[in-house]
């Protein structure tokens, strides 16, 4: 069997473990030397203090025994070296072994993984042997359970083990090799590696990947491409978003007279259409925003003020962003009831259209709808469905978002109304969507998720929902079919994502549900 390179992370890990074992066992095994003094007969407080000669009788001393201590250390060293050597030999011989894909999560040099394995019929005490392997590599066990075997072999055990553990990334290959030596059918229930996603709201600081497709510095067709003053202004406002961290108040922007004039033209033009084209939820929230959050034609509302308004209404908060975010990062923010919102405004030469999201689009289109409880939940559900989803599913969810949150229609009082932010912030498309020209289809998440769309001109197809509640129910049904090795739940108290990947995690979540049910039952009892 080839000897592993002494410089590999696995070999270094073994040497460290052996060194620690030497120290621990040296303390645990008390060995008395040949010339050590015997017990004192005079009651001297100091071991080894000589008693008077007349009363002292030397006692025979046992010969020093070091064989067992040396044997333990030598056995441990050989065992670890053998495991490293076995891992070094096994990895190249298994080219199809998905060692790198088995990690569920990686952070600070540690890999967290889920494993399933079955005991070998020829080796008793398979679980204790596997646990010994985990101890060898100083793995931290998060969860361990036995399960009925999903694919028992003829004459083999009908039991398998599931373990979730954390181990140094450099020791992963050797640990897996060690588990294979004492058990069989070692595999990961999670399958392919799950993409990283934020677990805490503060981790949204990492969700800042921008799409530069419509950046005025790069897009030749952008209205502001040839305007150096506008481009410099955009960079100045974008820096606010780049410096922002969760928990900070959103810095205020002093808008120029030209920017306010652009806002005024958009504001007054669209407001004239809302009464006949916008849904009731938008109209109700818009009136409240005018009353409490500085919405008026001669003032561009500040994000901090609007964020406080939304927080009180539906729990949603705003967060400044420098431009168009990647779909994965943007949808992940919605899972925490956080909406990434731009602060810059479109170019003055094109007030009725912007190739990218700007504050007119966000404040006039998105914010009023996020003030509605049912719609806010619908938006968060899309975000929750995106966490840990594959790239293919992210593309479908972002398309679904496009045809609902951005360009969705709904039925109200026998009429079709607009609720999508892309419609409510675009005068031309708001007229177009309710004309006879486009095709109107009943909302079906499966169809909407794969429907081709336009981002350069008006849509040729729109989807109409019976109600927001109906759309929410259909979305949840669609999301339940997304393949993930876990489910997720938002904790509104800690603003964190609970990953439901074990019976214990589900049980903890149910305890909170039971508390809420008890409160509601008590309320009904008091009312009755």
From Swiss-Prot:
Designated gene of the protein: TH
Function summary: Catalyzes the conversion of L-tyrosine to L-dihydroxyphenylalanine (L-Dopa), the rate-limiting step in the biosynthesis of catecholamines, dopamine, noradrenaline, and adrenaline. Uses tetrahydrobiopterin and molecular oxygen to convert tyrosine to L-Dopa. In addition to tyrosine, is able to catalyze the hydroxylation of phenylalanine and tryptophan with lower specificity. Positively regulates the regression of retinal hyaloid vessels during postnatal development.
Keywords attached to this entry: Catecholamine biosynthesis, Cell projection, Cytoplasm, Cytoplasmic vesicle, Disease variant, Dystonia, Iron, Metal-binding, Monooxygenase, Neurotransmitter biosynthesis, Nucleus, Oxidoreductase, Parkinson disease, Parkinsonism, Phosphoprotein, Synapse
Effect of residue 394 to T: In ARSEGS; complete loss of tyrosine 3-monooxygenase activity
Protein name, UniProt field: Tyrosine 3-monooxygenase
GO biological process terms held by the UniProt record: anatomical structure morphogenesis; animal organ morphogenesis; dopamine biosynthetic process; dopamine biosynthetic process from tyrosine; eating behavior; embryonic camera-type eye morphogenesis; epinephrine biosynthetic process; eye photoreceptor cell development
Disease: Segawa syndrome autosomal recessive: A form of DOPA-responsive dystonia presenting in infancy or early childhood. Dystonia is defined by the presence of sustained involuntary muscle contractions, often leading to abnormal postures. Some cases present with parkinsonian symptoms in infancy. Unlike all other forms of dystonia, it is an eminently treatable condition, due to a favorable response to L-DOPA.
Result of changing residue 498 to G: In ARSEGS; loss of over 80% of tyrosine 3-monooxygenase activity
Substrates-to-products reaction catalysed: (6R)-L-erythro-5,6,7,8-tetrahydrobiopterin + L-tyrosine + O2 = (4aS,6R)-4a-hydroxy-L-erythro-5,6,7,8-tetrahydrobiopterin + L-dopa
Post-translational modification: Phosphorylated on Ser-19, Ser-62 and Ser-71 by several protein kinases with different site specificities. Phosphorylation at Ser-62 and Ser-71 leads to an increase of TH activity. Phosphorylation at Ser-71 activates the enzyme and also counteracts the feedback inhibition of TH by catecholamines. Phosphorylation of Ser-19 and Ser-62 triggers the proteasomal degradation of TH through the ubiquitin-proteasome pathway. Phosphorylation at Ser-62 facilitates transport of TH from the soma to the nerve terminals via the microtubule network.
Annotated pathway: Catecholamine biosynthesis; dopamine biosynthesis; dopamine from L-tyrosine: step 1/2
Positions annotated to bind Fe cation: 361, 366, 406
Effect on the protein upon substituting residue 359 to F: In ARSEGS; loss of over 80% of tyrosine 3-monooxygenase activity
CC cofactor: Fe(2+)
GO CC term, one of those recorded: synaptic vesicle
Annotated phenotype, changing residue 387 to M: In ARSEGS; no effect on tyrosine 3-monooxygenase activity
Phylogenetic placement of the source organism: Eukaryota, Metazoa, Chordata, Craniata, Vertebrata
Family: Belongs to the biopterin-dependent aromatic amino acid hydroxylase family.
Gene3D superfamilies according to UniProt: 3.30.70.260, Aromatic amino acid hydroxylase (1.10.800.10)
Biological source species: Homo sapiens
Activity: how regulated: Inhibited in feedback fashion by the catecholamine neurotransmitters, especially by dopamine in competition with tetrahydrobiopterin. Phosphorylation of several Ser/Thr residues in the N-terminus regulates the catalytic activity. Ser-62 and Ser-71 are readily phosphorylated to activate the catalytic activity. A Cysteine modification induced by N-ethylmaleimide (NEM), inhibits tyrosine 3-monooxygenase activity through the modification of the Cys-207.
Entry's localization field: Cytoplasm, Perinuclear region; Nucleus; Cell projection, Axon; Cytoplasm
E.C. numbers: 1.14.16.2
Subunit structure as annotated in this protein's UniProt entry: Homotetramer. Interacts (when phosphorylated at Ser-19) with YWHAG; one YWHAG dimer binds to one TH tetramer and this interaction may influence the phosphorylation and dephosphorylation of other sites. Interacts with NT5DC2; the interaction results in reduced phosphorylation and decreased catalytic activity of TH.
Mutation effect (residue 276 to P): In ARSEGS; parkinsonian symptoms in infancy; no effect on tyrosine 3-monooxygenase activity
Effect of substituting residue 62 to A: Affects subcellular localization. Accumulates mainly in the soma of the neuroblastoma cells
Class in the EC hierarchy, top level: oxidoreductase
Main subcellular location: cytoplasm
């Amino acid at each position: 069997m080839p000897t592993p390179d002494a410089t590999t992370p696995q070999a270094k890990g073994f040497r460290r473990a052996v060194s620690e074992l030497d120290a621990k066992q040296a303390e645990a095994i008390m060995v008395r030397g040949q010339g050590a003094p015997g017990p004192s007969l005079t009651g001297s407080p100091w071991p080894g203090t000589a008693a008077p000669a007349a009363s002292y009788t030397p006692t025979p001393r046992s010969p020093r025994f070091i064989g067992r201590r040396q044997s333990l250390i030598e056995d441990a060293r050989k065992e670890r070296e053998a495991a490293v050597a076995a891992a070094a030999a096994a990895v190249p011989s298994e080219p199809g072994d998905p060692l790198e894909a088995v990690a569920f999560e990686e952070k600070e040099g540690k890999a967290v993984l889920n494993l399933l394995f079955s005991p070998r019929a020829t080796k008793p005490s398979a679980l204790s042997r596997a646990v010994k392997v985990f101890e060898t590599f100083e793995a931290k066990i998060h969860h361990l359970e036995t399960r009925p075997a999903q694919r028992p072999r003829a004459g083999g055990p009908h039991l398998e083990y599931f373990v979730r553990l954390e181990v140094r990334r450099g020791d992963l290959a050797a640990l897996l090799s060690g588990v294979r030596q004492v058990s069989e059918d070692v595999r990961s229930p999670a399958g392919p590696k799950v993409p990283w996603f934020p677990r805490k709201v503060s981790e949204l600081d990492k969700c800042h990947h921008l799409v530069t497709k419509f950046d005025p510095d790069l897009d030749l067709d952008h209205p502001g491409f040839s305007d150096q003053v506008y481009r410099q202004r955009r960079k100045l406002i974008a820096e606010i978003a780049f410096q922002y961290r969760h928990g900070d108040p959103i810095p205020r922007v002093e808008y120029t007279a030209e920017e306010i004039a652009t806002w005024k033209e958009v504001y007054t033009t669209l407001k004239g259409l809302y009464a006949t084209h916008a849904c009731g939820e938008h109209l109700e929230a818009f009136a409240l925003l005018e009353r409490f959050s500085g919405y008026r034609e001669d003032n561009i509302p500040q994000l901090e003020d609007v964020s406080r308004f939304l927080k009180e209404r539906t729990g949603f908060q705003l967060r400044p962003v420098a431009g168009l975010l990647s779909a994965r990062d943007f949808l992940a923010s919605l899972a925490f009831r956080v909406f990434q919102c731009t602060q810059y405004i479109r170019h003055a030469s094109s007030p009725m259209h912007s190739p990218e999201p700007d504050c007119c689009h966000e404040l006039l289109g998105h914010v009023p709808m996020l003030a509605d409880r049912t719609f806010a939940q619908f938006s968060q559900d899309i975000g929750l469905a995106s966490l840990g989803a594959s790239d293919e599913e992210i593309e479908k969810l972002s398309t679904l978002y496009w045809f609902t949150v951005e360009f969705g229609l709904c039925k109200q009082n026998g009429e079709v109304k607009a609720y999508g932010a892309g419609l409510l912030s675009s005068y031309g498309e708001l007229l177009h969507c309710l004309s006879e020209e486009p095709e109107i289809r009943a909302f079906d998440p499966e169809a909407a998720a794969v429907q081709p769309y336009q981002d350069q001109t008006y849509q040729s197809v729109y989807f109409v929902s019976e109600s927001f509640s109906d759309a929410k129910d259909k979305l949840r049904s669609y999301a339940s079919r997304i393949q993930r090795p876990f489910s997720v739940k938002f904790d509104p108290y800690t603003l964190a994502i609970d990953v439901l990947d074990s019976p214990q995690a589900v049980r903890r979540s149910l305890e909170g549900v039971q508390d809420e049910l008890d409160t509601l039952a008590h309320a009904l009892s008091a009312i009755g």
